[in-house]
């Protein structure tokens, strides 16, 4: 429950901050009449992401068992890639997003005829990317946790993100965003490592990967996944009481380089600024 909550809170907060920055800039530049276009972009993006998530979730239930395992592995790999990209993209461009977002708004509203649609498209792409990141992660999370806790956590995370975003816009809440994104990003890397290990397990169950399947260690008597702590760690980090050599290897092959790159001093380059502009206004 906590992992879907945190991911949706973080992703929802990113989307809420984007909308908040757009609204503040439009208000500050006396262009508040364009807020309708902003909300059109937000709603269309949200509906599209929700529809994609529901469609994928419903159609995969009809697959035979091995195909379901294969799909779970693919979704886990996609989720790992998206989460990793999300962490390192935010690390690079968090200080320059506002500048480039305002530039993208000016470009959209100075585009002549169809400027309203240009603003709708800009907001749509900015919000839809955050939404699609969430969709693929939640699909992976829901496959690992089939209980009601994961959907409830995701909904609560999104609601909290919206409330915090509104509070930030109205000036009632001051959140140290740099620290927030830094520590949630670190947490997400451990989550992604667990998903990577889960992907190799799914590929084995689908019959695609049969190497290094010896049990690396067995902690059943020490920390079983049926215990409260074991269940918590399984849902949060993909913990397994008796993982195979391949699962442990994939976990650390992903996690160690990711942590090294994460703690390296970030580069402040024009390339980061260009990346930010492309994500906001492709």
UniProtKB/Swiss-Prot annotation:
Query: How does the record say this protein sits in the membrane?
Result: Multi-pass membrane protein
Transmembrane spans: 2-22, 36-56, 70-90, 119-139, 148-168, 180-200, 245-265
Signal sequence coordinates? none
Q: Which GO terms describe its cellular component?
A: high-affinity iron permease complex; plasma membrane
**Could you tell me where this protein is found in the cell?**
Cell inner membrane
Keyword tags: Cell inner membrane, Cell membrane, Ion transport, Iron, Iron transport, Membrane, Transmembrane, Transmembrane helix, Transport
Spans within the Cytoplasmic topological domain: 23-35, 91-118, 169-179, 266-282
- State any GO BP term from the record: iron ion transmembrane transport
Q: Which residues lie on this side of the membrane: Periplasmic?
A: 1, 57-69, 140-147, 201-244
Which GO-annotated molecular functions does the record name?
ferrous iron transmembrane transporter activity
* Its job: Uptake of Fe(2+) ions across the membrane.
The annotated subunit structure for this chain is: Part of a ferrous iron transporter composed of EfeU, EfeO and EfeB.
Describe the family membership recorded for this protein in Swiss-Prot or TrEMBL: Belongs to the oxidase-dependent Fe transporter (OFeT) (TC 9.A.10.1) family.
NCBIfam families per record? EfeU
> What's the name of the protein?
Ferrous iron permease EfeU
**Species this protein is from:** Yersinia pestis
């Amino acid at each position: 429950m906590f992992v879907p909550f945190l991911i949706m809170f973080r992703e929802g907060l990113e989307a809420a901050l984007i909308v908040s920055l757009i609204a503040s800039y439009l208000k500050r530049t006396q262009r508040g009449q364009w807020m309708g276009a902003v909300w059109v972009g937000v709603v269309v993006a949200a509906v599209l992401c929700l529809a994609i998530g529901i469609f994928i979730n419903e159609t995969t239930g009809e697959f035979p068992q091995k195909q379901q395992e294969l799909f779970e592995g693919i979704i886990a790999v996609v989720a790992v890639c998206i989460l990793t990209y999300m962490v390192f993209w935010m690390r690079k461009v968090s200080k320059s997003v506002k500048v480039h977002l305002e530039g993208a708004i000016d470009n959209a509203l100075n585009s002549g005829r169809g400027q309203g649609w240009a603003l709708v498209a800009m907001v749509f792409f900015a919000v839809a990317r955050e939404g699609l990141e969430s969709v693929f992660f939640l699909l992976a999370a829901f496959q690992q946790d089939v209980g009601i806790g994961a959907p409830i956590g995701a909904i609560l995370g999104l609601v909290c993100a919206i409330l915090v975003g509104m509070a930030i816009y109205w000036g009632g809440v001051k959140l140290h965003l740099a620290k927030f994104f830094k520590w949630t990003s670190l947490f997400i890397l451990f989550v992604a490592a667990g998903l990577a290990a889960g992907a190799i397990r799914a590929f084995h169950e689908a019959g695609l990967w049969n190497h290094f399947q010896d049990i690396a260690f067995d902690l059943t008597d020490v920390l079983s996944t049926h215990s409260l702590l074991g269940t918590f760690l399984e849902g949060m980090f993909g913990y397994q009481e008796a993982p195979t050599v391949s699962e442990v290897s994939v976990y650390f092959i992903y996690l160690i380089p990711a942590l090294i790159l994460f703690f390296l001093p970030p580069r402040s380059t024009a390339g980061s600024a260009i990346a930010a502009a492309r994500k906001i206004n492709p």
